Every structure is written in C-alpha cells, then in structure tokens.
C-alpha cells in the first residue's frame, strides 16, 4: 500500500509569521498535534508541533523534576514571560530540518522514516511540492485494518 492511498490531502497549514498563541489555537481547534509551516507561495518551511510549543512555554520543564521548590519560586516570573512568548513568531521555534516522504512511497517506508527520525507526521511530497500529510496514526490504523481486520 502506498502513502498516496491514505494521506490527508486537505492539510491544515500555519503561516510562518503566526504567533505561538495563534499556532496553539489552530492545533487545538482542529484537534491535531502538529502542522506544516508555510512561507511565501505556500512553500513548506518547517513543522510546528505540540512538543515545540510546550518547550517554548516551559523551556525549563526539566527543573520541575529536579527541583520543585526552585521551579515554584520562578513561577511568577514565568507567568509574565508567557504573556510575552504568546506573541513570538513560530518561525523561531519550528522544526526546520524537514523530513518528508514521497507520495509513491510504501506505508512501511513512511513508518520506518517516522520511527528512525522520532517524528509522528511527514509532509508528503510530489515533485518537490507538498501534496498532503501522513501521520503515524494513519499508518497504524491502516495496518491494523489490513493485518488484523480491525
């Protein structure tokens, strides 16, 4: 089975000059965990994910685990900074190292690319242009249907 058979063709994209707040709203409203970021002429320039947003809003989240008292004492300053961060452009935090898959690739190849690169979505490319997106969940569902009849 090929990527083109199950990819999502109507891709929700986010403009590269969108703010963190706008990107978070788009992801939440559409119940998706990430989206391609596009620049001029709808050119694919990156990917933004919940993980990117989480890291932007909570850059020192590891402090919570190592020293809760220190983290709590910083919370007031952190709240003020969060308001400023909401206005930052996603182009500052998006993943720029694009990992893509060709429209004619097999589902196994797409899944392997995701596993090796630890990503959960891949823009689907035909002749250098994005024509869709495929997620780990898309592949998992299809494989369950085929292999187990679920």
Which residues does each PLM region occupy?
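Bateman/CBS regulatory modules and CBS-like beta-alpha motifs in cytosolic regions of diverse proteins
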Residues: 1-26, 32, 37-40, 44-45, ...
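Short, basic and Ser/Thr-rich N-terminal targeting/leader segments
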Residues: 30-31, 118
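A short, polar/charged loop-to-alpha-helix boundary motif
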Residues: 54-70, 140-150
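Short hydrophobic beta-strand motif reused across regulatory alpha/beta modules
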Residues: 46-49, 133-139
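Hydrophobic alpha-helical segments with strong N-terminal bias
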Residues: 13, 53-54, 120
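Gly/Ser-rich helix-loop-strand patches that form or flank binding pockets
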Residues: 117, 121, 136-147
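N-terminal short leaders/motifs
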Residues: 46-52, 56, 78-79
């Amino acid at each position: 089975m090929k990527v083109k058979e199950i990819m999502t063709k109507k891709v929700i994209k986010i403009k590269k000059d969108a703010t963190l707040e706008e990107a978070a709203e788009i992801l939440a409203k559409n119940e998706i965990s990430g989206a391609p970021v596009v620049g001029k002429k709808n050119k694919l320039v990156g990917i933004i994910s919940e993980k990117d947003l989480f890291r932007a809003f909570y850059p020192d989240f590891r402090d919570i685990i190592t020293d809760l008292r220190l983290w709590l004492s910083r919370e007031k300053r952190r709240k003020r900074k969060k308001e400023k961060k909401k206005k930052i452009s996603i182009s500052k935090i998006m993943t720029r190292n694009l990992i893509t898959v060709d429209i004619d690739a097999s589902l196994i190849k797409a899944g392997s690319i995701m596993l090796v690169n630890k990503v959960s979505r891949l823009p689907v490319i035909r002749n250098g242009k994005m024509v869709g997106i495929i997620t780990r969940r898309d592949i998992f569902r299809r494989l369950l249907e085929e292999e187990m009849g679920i």
